[in-house]
A protein has these predicted regions:
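Preference for long, amphipathic alpha-helical scaffolds in soluble/luminal domains
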Residues: 1-8, 15-21, 25-352
Length: 352
């Protein structure tokens, strides 16, 4: 399926006039830093990332880093995640940094399930209560909206507009359904939600990168593997035809961001195929995947963290998002053998 690429375009002359300043409502992003050469020894990568995590991350991301890379305790991650849990069984309190305020929101649910999946703890009474919560907040078609309307003016990212009667979206429903299926959760809520996802995935025509990511998350966990493989093959062709993925980071100027995305907010093969067993891995050649992972490794900044390509809309959200991006980068690099398969360096030692 991977095909030939177009020839590179002529670069803009350095003396060309600066393009006009975008209107105030146009998404903006911090300028991309120069990409350093990836280090040959993986330990400095982890050392720098660890320092960045201790300096900037929330308690949850600190505990997650310790669990995944320092033989930390899963209970500590669980406890940190529990501080975002609401009495209704959902998650809030800016667990996803793009949605501020205490209210339970579907994006927070997807974030919590990713954390629990990484711990191997996506089961039990907590998940039963969560599914009951999802049953009570679903749209008439059994799906989840991106953002529920809030009784107070809690801040949200401008790319997540709030509607009085929001429709169900694959963007949120896909990851939640996929992660529950991946962990063999069975609940009545999943029946209609799964049908919704199948309908959206198999009828996608014009789409955008984050919606594709959500479709991949659904296909990654859904039980019908033959149907998932067929849907993934079709989706991969669509992604390449619509140029939704930067296949060669050296030619990223040829892949403009999707409408509504910030300048530089482009996705690469590793953003879709986060693990070698992902249904999206077959969309890309070995060479395309190698270039993508080289680019990811080289994107580590001088402070040890990875950049965020989304629109910078609030200082707190941007600060909280970078450690999350750093953890995702490290986990992806390790999944592809770019870091040690299991890091067992000693974790933090409490004072005597």
């Amino acid at each position: 399926m991977p095909g030939d690429e177009a020839s590179p375009q002529s670069p803009r002359s350095p003396r060309s006039p600066r393009p006009p300043r975008p209107p105030a409502h146009t998404p903006t992003a911090l300028p991309a830093p120069p990409a350093p050469r990836p280090p040959s020894d993986p330990l400095p990568v982890l050392d720098r990332a660890e320092r960045f995590i201790w300096l900037t991350a929330r308690v949850l991301e600190q505990r997650r880093f310790a669990f995944h890379f320092l033989d930390g305790d899963a209970d500590a991650v669980d406890t940190a995640l529990g501080s975002y849990l609401n009495p209704d069984g959902g998650y809030g309190h800016a667990l996803d940094p793009d949605l501020r305020g205490p209210l339970s929101q579907p994006l927070h649910t997807a974030h919590a399930l990713r954390v629990l999946d990484g711990l191997g703890r996506c089961a039990g009474q907590r998940i039963e209560r969560l599914c009951r919560h999802l049953t009570g907040v679903s749209t008439p078609d059994g799906a989840l909206p991106v953002v529920f309307p809030a009784p107070h003016d809690y801040p949200t990212a401008p790319y997540h507009p709030m509607h009085d009667d929001p429709p169900g979206e694959l963007l949120t429903t896909g990851p939640v359904v996929g992660l529950l299926h991946r962990n063999r959760v069975w609940h009545a809520w999943l029946f209609r939600a799964t049908d919704f996802c199948w309908d959206r995935v198999e009828n996608l025509h014009r789409t955008h990168p984050y919606e594709v990511q959500s479709a991949v998350a659904f296909l990654d966990g859904v039980p019908d593997r033959a149907r998932a493989a067929a849907a993934a093959d079709r989706l991969g062709r669509l992604v390449r035809e619509q140029r939704l993925v930067v296949l060669d980071p050296r030619r990223r100027a040829e892949y403009p961001p999707a409408p509504g995305y910030a300048p530089g907010e482009q996705l690469f093969p590793h953003d879709f195929a986060r693990r070698p067993e992902s249904p999206a891995r077959g969309w890309f050649t070995d060479e395309e995947m190698r270039r993508s992972l080289d680019f990811l490794a080289a994107a580590q900044q001088a402070d040890g963290g990875w950049p965020v390509r989304r629109e910078a809309w609030a200082p707190g959200s941007s600060l909280e998002r970078r450690p999350i991006a750093t953890l995702e980068a490290l986990l992806t690099l390790r999944a592809y053998g770019r870091l040690p398969a299991r890091v067992s360096r000693p974790g933090p030692v409490p004072p005597r």
